[in-house]
Amino acid sequence: MLRLNVRSTGWSTDDVQLQVILSGEGLPTTDFDHFGVIGPCAHTMTAPFPLVAVSLRLLLVRHGLSSFNIERRIQGRNDLSTLTATGEDQARRMGMALADVPIDAAYSSPLQRAAATTAGVLSVRQDGLAPVLDDGLLEIDLEPWSGLTADERAIQDPEGYATWRQRPEELELTRADGTRYQPVTELMVQARAFLKGLMERHPVTGDDTVLVVGHNAILRCLILVLLGEPQGGFRRLRLDNASLSVFNLSSGTHGYQVQIECLNSIAHLEPALPAKGTKARLVLVRHGETDWNRQGRFQGQIDIPLNSNGHAQAEAARSFLEAVTLDRAYSSSMSRPRETAEGILKSHSGVPLTVTDGLMEIGHGLWEGKLESEIREGWDELLQAWKDAPETVQMPEGETIQDVWERSVACWNTIADGLDPSETALVVAHDAVNKTILCHLLGLAPKDIWAVKQGNGGVTVIDMPEDPSQPAVVSCLNLTSHLGGVLDRTAAGAL
């Protein structure tokens, strides 16, 4: 048997880790994908890129539905809230989704709603993995509000409630002993310390997969620390009960490099997408696979159509989104996203599809149509700069990331601003376009584009904020379970 595990931290195949395990059964005709084996291909495969160390993978799971969640009570750091029967079922479903994923260590908040979730997740495994209960995963300390319902809190402390909703990083509360403190500031210190300790035990140069089970606020803070603490990031994220977020960490030129593989996936639950609020929603999809994706060729603005697997991915996305009410649809004017959008819309007859050049892929100029090995022959230093500091690179006769950022974000804002609050729009575009849009929404910068994974056929959901003074919410990012497995198994090719 031949098994291939491939990880990529960017669009390029130079940053790919390849692991081959051989047995005496001979070599099957298999094609390699992002984290496993799929499809038929020839026996011989070449890798025109250096092999690098496996990254550290973090599986971040929020606890299942609790008694206080149902009652809409503030839980914070108290341990009065218990896991409900629904929460127990959610934990088991999470465990089943992760059953085939090797996990080297598990850490959990000691609060019973999280500890019970961890027990449920691990109960379906056969490896006897025991969790470590770590105070570094305790939930945010909201002592003065503990046990209050959301309505009671708004009545008793309207000023504090407004600050919590609009500027949570600035919230100050008073403990029973009279001391003043800032809950989010304290929690960020806690998150930094937890991650520092975790990475000392599980270095990014290793190959560990670590399960971390915690609470809404502490997990948000962990994510913000991983992303470099973008300004106003706390309200840009959504984490549902029993959701899974996957982060890959690898050695970088400055410390470690982070990649969001997926965020707030509840595809193992029903319904498979977070509930829509009262404002507009946008469903962002990357186009299906092309032959050039598979080969690792830089496509850019060369109009390569979907291959057979790309059409199958579009069909899988159609099935995954079938129950979603779509009111409008937008696509890049290029063939591969347009074909993907048309495939998804087969379940949404009558929904008009608008194509726009604003969502076109980055122009790679003279790099288009070339493999990385070919690009390296003529632009070795520029290609390395593209990997290390993409915001500094002017593509030869092509675009910069800033160029793509400006036109894609402007196009996105035009689409979002044109939606009625009740509407949901489908938007299908490309890797670089989606990355720049999502970096913008997460409060990141053009230099951070490698932090966002966008698999072929992957689904991302963005919700417009209830409060117009607040940023849009990334409700989930790069869902690919409809393409097979809880981890992203899409091709690790170039743009």
Language-model region placement:
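Phosphate-coordination/substrate-recognition cap region in phosphate-metabolizing enzymes
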Residues: 46-55, 92-162, 315-384
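Extended, hydrophobic interaction surfaces within ordered domains
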Residues: 89-92, 96, 110, 116, ...
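Alpha-helix boundary/capping motif
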Residues: 2, 15-18, 34
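Acidic, low-complexity terminal tails and accessory targeting/binding regions
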Residues: 36-41, 46-57, 143-152, 206-208, ...
